[in-house]
């Protein structure tokens, strides 16, 4: 006799159902309207088809409005896109089509690659298929049957996928009407539930299975959302992001470029290097007093990287150099450092340390190199050579909480100086594969959980916090700091990571109050992370309209007539003496032409001088993005612009001095 199936509902109630009861049956037992709105079920958090028999556990009925339904909407849209393509271009082979962030894609094998002009045609056919409202149904096939059917259809890529599935394992085949595909599922009840809030975005080339030795396929990307409003908002953000693309701004503002001879490394132009150095100078000032700035070697012997563990698990991403030995020595293998931490441990170990000297805080604007795949490179955001605003704190167990809070205060203060208000701090806890005892992890996670509570309490609701279970590094738990930019995108930047691994590997120790050797806690800390990436984020956040204090070129003095050139030189000199970065434009061009030209390069302030201004010893100030003009005396302009161009930390320092 079959036992009933026990299901626990979100309200805590428990009900018994007969074996073979489907998710749809359960929904109908609650209400007809719920069954009509439902698109899937979740058993213990795992999404399943409505047609699946339920199994014992916690059940949730998933409706189309549920956030989890978005993955199903996108998955189903991918299948409908594949059907549309094969209806329009018979003989096209369908390969794989997963859901990705904000959308989906499918890879197709076609004699002539798709072009952007094909996308509206495919979209139109997709809408027709959705309107047919065909049910998604599932069959289970044997491996042999699947190979035979796909071979007859000429789907050689599907045959290869089936071959990769273990012997004896049954395969799921999903139908929508007569069209079918190999798929793990789940899917919604019918194509009609996808809705019409979708759009095909672009075509691209993609090698089969990501291997350049395999044939090139055509990948079609799409996006799909619950509602048209959500789709419109997403497309608006994409359009804004394109206008704000830091690579485009880098060209327009003459900041940097990349070229084939140095893939993934930045060629900084004069203005770009100026803004980069301004960022470094600001960060360096924020470290004064609390940190020792150090500098570790760029190139270190393989043996050090073997000790650190990088050689074992990161070697393929390291730039390696082999140096020929002489007659008595073998060749030596060196590597460019991908991280600063092993070098900082060597500095900490140089000389005996007492507990009275702790915490020791070592900081470095360290140039690191990592061999990223060429396809992953993306302007300043993903490079092979970059600068980390790295620091490592060596402290006692008892000092760890205070150090984490101190780091948190610094990170939040830096983000606020750059105008970022929406910050999320999350604690990543122990992963399955890790070093260190459970007792060590218990203690560290308990301390960091209390720190997280303190961060939330002190922020009075301004800072959101959360937990990322199992997302910690193998060597210790960590805090991740994510900031939101002007168009709502999230960027993970800062980290605070506790490390049990490296101090042990390198035998780092201090002498405690009992004259015993103790292993220090090592805390990795980064605020910007990659300085290059953070600069890219700033450029996109401000759309190139950088705050005056961090702008690469702060003022252009432009004259209306040659009669004002001498006065223009005096104005420029006064502004330079006040600490501003100034260029002059005395060309024989109309002033509106000059203003437009400098606006394209995102100069924040244009100081206009004509004959009248020279006579009155005044200036006319025009701001980037504004039609307004402000007239003021030269003395007022120098004082006002000088104050505005002062970095936030220097303003605070001046205010403290004035109060003292």
UniProtKB/Swiss-Prot annotation:
Cofactor binding summary note: Binds 1 zinc ion per subunit.
One Gene Ontology term from the biological process aspect of the record: threonyl-tRNA aminoacylation
Location of the TGS domain: 1-64
Residues annotated as transmembrane: none
Catalytic activity as recorded in UniProt: tRNA(Thr) + L-threonine + ATP = L-threonyl-tRNA(Thr) + AMP + diphosphate + H(+)
Pfam families in the cross-refs: HGTP_anticodon (PF03129), TGS (PF02824), tRNA-synt_2b (PF00587), tRNA_SAD (PF07973)
Gene that produces this protein: thrS
Gene Ontology cellular component terms for the protein in this record: cytosol
Intracellular or extracellular location(s): Cytoplasm
Cofactor: Zn(2+)
Protein name stated in the entry: Threonine--tRNA ligase
Oligomeric and partner information: Homodimer.
Biological role stated in the UniProt entry: Catalyzes the attachment of threonine to tRNA(Thr) in a two-step reaction: L-threonine is first activated by ATP to form Thr-AMP and then transferred to the acceptor end of tRNA(Thr). Also edits incorrectly charged L-seryl-tRNA(Thr).
InterPro entries attached to this UniProt entry: aa-tRNA-synt_IIb (IPR002314), aa-tRNA-synth_II (IPR006195), aa-tRNA-synth_II/BPL/LPL (IPR045864), Anticodon-bd (IPR004154), Anticodon-bd_dom_sf (IPR036621), Beta-grasp_dom_sf (IPR012675), TGS (IPR004095), TGS-like (IPR012676)
PROSITE patterns for this protein: AA_TRNA_LIGASE_II, TGS
A GO molecular-function annotation: tRNA binding
Keyword Membrane (UniProt): no
Binding site for Zn(2+): 341, 392, 524
Family per record: Belongs to the class-II aminoacyl-tRNA synthetase family.
UniProt entry keywords in alphabetical sequence: Aminoacyl-tRNA synthetase, ATP-binding, Cytoplasm, Ligase, Metal-binding, Nucleotide-binding, Protein biosynthesis, RNA-binding, tRNA-binding, Zinc
Main enzyme class: ligase
Assigned EC number: 6.1.1.3
